Structure formats: structure tokens, C-alpha cells
Amino acid sequence: MDYINAALLGVIEGITEFLPISSTGHLIIAEQWLGHRSDMFNIVIQAGAILAVTIIYWRRLLDLVLGWREPANRDYAAKLIVAFLITAVLGLVVKKVLHFELPETATPIAWALIIGGFWMIFAEWAAARKAPHKEITWLVAILVGIAQIVAGIFPGTSRSGATIFVAMLAGTGNRAAATEFAFLVGIPTMYAASGYELLKTFKDGGAANEDWTALGIAFVVSTIVAFIAVKWLLAYIRSNRFTLFAVYRIILGVLLLGMAATGLIG
């Protein structure tokens, strides 16, 4: 993999990992033109995005750890842990028992983008008719944990999109509160998933022939771009709905279906 392709994939990962437009879907599509990427490369660029959001939320995370004696912090942290554990257990079942593999064609991704776009529009409509509560309930925590697995099974769904809008529909009508919980749950989830895949890759000898310069470039680019993207998103949702992302998903999904039908992509 050349360095320009590595940087481009880092940009794609950085932009799409935490925006509700599906990073996995975009990367699978990008692979059609930029070439196949190794498991190690996937792990590295995702690690960059995770690091970015960890830096953004480091004060909040530190507050939860140091302020665990406070009931509100303890309750919030417990819900994060429950959501993470649900994802971890279901993830192992999907991986080890069901032997799930990501699709390599664009058509299922296109449909997931389209369906997810309409789902986002509905979620915004439904949430607007509820009081904008900031509270994260136990129901929200459980459903967010499940939503992370659903997003992992269906690339194009978007982990952030699925978790944010499940939280909004389940009672957390405040966009900022739903987004924060979704991102905070994503931090341990993605670190655990990346760590698991990294150990597996080293064990299988998959890291032996990697271009570490390309990996380093992709990691740095992914971190910087993800930091900018998340900062922008958090500012954007203070006064805007997610409708822009929903429309983008639907348009992209339709375009991909057309390209797949005409043989432009696989």
C-alpha cells in the first residue's frame, strides 16, 4: 500500500468513524478503488479514531473515575459498563459461535445506508415529540449495547448512528446527551475490539510483512481528522438535527445501488 492511499484511508476513517454515516461501509467501498487493506491496517486506523475521541472526552472520563463516590457518576459509569458488557458478550457470540464475516460487496452496504437514513429521520421526528430529557436510563444502556452489535453485523448501519438514535428513541431526547453516551460507550468497546483483533493478528503472524511507515501515516491522519470531525459534530448538533446525515446516507446508498447494478463496483 502506498503512502497516499494510506493517508486517504486514514482521512476516510477519521471522518466516518464517529459521524453517523458508517466507517466500515465507506472503507469497504473505498477498497474497491484503493485496494485491499490488511487486518492490521484496519486496526491501526480505528485506533487513531479511538484515541481522538478519548482525548476529547478525557476530562469526562477522569471525572467518572475520580468521582465514582458521587451517586450520579457511579450510576452513569455503571450504565456504560452494562452497555459495554452486553456488546462484548453478544460480540463474542457473533464472532465465535456464528462465525460472522463482513460482506465484501457494496449492495448490502447500500441498503443499510438507505434504511439507516430513513431510520434517522424517523428517530428525529419521534424524539422531537418527547421532552428533551438528558437522563440515561437503564433501558437506554441496554439498547445501546445491543445497537452496537447490530451496527457491527450490518456494515453501513453506523455504530454511532445506531447508538445515538436508539438512545433518543428510548427516552434520551437530548441530542448532546445521547451522543455523549454513545461515544463514551464506544471508547471501551472499540479499544476491546481493536485489542482482540491486534492480538489475533500478531498470533497469526499477520504483522510480519506490514509497511509500518504506511501504518504510522494512516494512524496519525486518522487521529487528527477524527479529532476535527468529532469536535465539529459536537458543535453542530447543539443547534442542528441529524437530517443532513440522513439525506447524505440515502443519496449515497441510491448511488451505490446504481453503480453496483451497472457493474462499476462489486
Swiss-Prot record:
Keyword Hydrolase on entry: yes
Any GO MF annotation of the entry: undecaprenyl-diphosphatase activity
Q: Which InterPro entries match?
A: UppP (IPR003824)
- What cellular-component terms does GO give this entry? plasma membrane
Q: What is its EC number?
A: 3.6.1.27
Pfam family for this entry, one? BacA
How is it placed in the membrane, per its record? Multi-pass membrane protein
Main subcellular localization, coarse class? membrane
Q: Where's it found, cell-wise?
A: Cell inner membrane
Query: Which additional comment does the entry carry?
Result: Bacitracin is thought to be involved in the inhibition of peptidoglycan synthesis by sequestering undecaprenyl diphosphate, thereby reducing the pool of lipid carrier available.
- Family statement: Belongs to the UppP family.
Q: What does this protein do?
A: Catalyzes the dephosphorylation of undecaprenyl diphosphate (UPP). Confers resistance to bacitracin.
- Could you tell me what this protein is called? Undecaprenyl-diphosphatase
Specify the species.
Rhizobium leguminosarum bv. trifolii (strain WSM2304)
